[in-house]
A protein has these predicted regions:
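Phosphodiester-processing cores and adjacent nucleic acid-binding clamps
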Residues: 1-261
Length: 261
């Protein structure tokens, strides 16, 4: 089975509110194809502005020899929040990442609708423009798009990975209390499976040398086994090749400010 890159960022789509990616849409598609991948998905930071560029480039290549089975898929990396976000509420004042991927044109319509709704609630908070999607917004949308959109738990900036890391030390210090945290993680997964439908929500693992990501990967596999929820492996790509890493680092450091969600 060929790899399909589900979680990727481009300069055209993810640099609207912050410095994030040095990838260019045409280069991403070409490189994924050259590696023999089955396809590539664009999941920008609450933005669908790269979709048109991606579709145009794909349409100009899909009939060429060797491109018959390659697919370009469109998604979005939203900020899935509780509705009590305020500047004073430091604990809940986070903007957890969450991945949406359209399985068809109808699904992409739903992603566009949700993105539009999020932008109507934008506000400037903590040095950058914030664009929240509330859980209630996602529930309302998925009532009409179940089976057309898949969701995933995203990167370390996601709600589930963040919770796993937040209470990591509690696992040894107070196993009884940690069991409650563990159950809350399983409850959150069950909630997502209910919203998206069984088999349409995924736990997201990412290859990394970072101890935090390695820990989260192990815990997500354990949660997958205990809940029967499938997992995917993504690269959360912000640059194409290993040798581009330093260039990407310099790009991020060229502007002060908080990149995080």
């Amino acid at each position: 089975v060929s790899f399909f890159g589900v979680h990727n960022h481009s300069a055209e789509g993810s640099n609207l509110r912050l410095r994030d990616s040095i990838n260019k849409v045409p280069e991403m598609i070409e490189y994924a194809h050259s590696l023999g991948h089955a396809g590539i998905c664009f999941t920008e930071h609450e933005s669908i502005t790269s979709s048109l560029d991606a579709l145009k480039y794909y349409d100009s290549h899909k009939d060429l020899e060797g491109w018959e089975n390659f697919k370009v898929v469109l998604g979005n990396e939203i900020y899935l929040c509780t509705e009590d976000i305020t500047a004073e509420n430091k604990f809940n004042n986070r903007y957890p990442h969450f991945i949406l991927v359209a399985l068809n044109a109808h699904g992409h319509q739903g992603i566009r609708e949700l993105s539009t709704k999020a932008w109507t609630k934008n506000s400037f908070m903590h040095v950058m423009m914030r664009v929240p999607t509330y859980y209630s917004d996602l529930e309302e949308l998925m009532a009409n798009y179940k089976g057309d959109i898949i969701g995933s738990s995203a990167c370390l900036g996601g709600a589930l990975p963040h919770r796993l890391l937040q209470f990591q030390d509690l696992e040894r210090a107070n196993p009884k209390e940690y069991e409650k945290i563990w159950q809350s993680c399983k409850d959150w997964i069950a909630y997502m499976n209910e919203i998206f439908g069984e088999g349409y929500f995924f736990l997201e693992l990412q290859p990394s040398h970072m101890m935090e990501q390695i820990y989260v990967n192990h815990k997500l596999i354990q949660l997958s086994e205990e809940t029967g929820t499938p997992y995917i492996i993504t690269t959360d790509a912000h640059y194409l090749k290993k040798e581009d890493r330093q260039i990407h680092k310099i790009f991020l450091e060229s502007q002060e400010g908080d990149r995080g969600g």
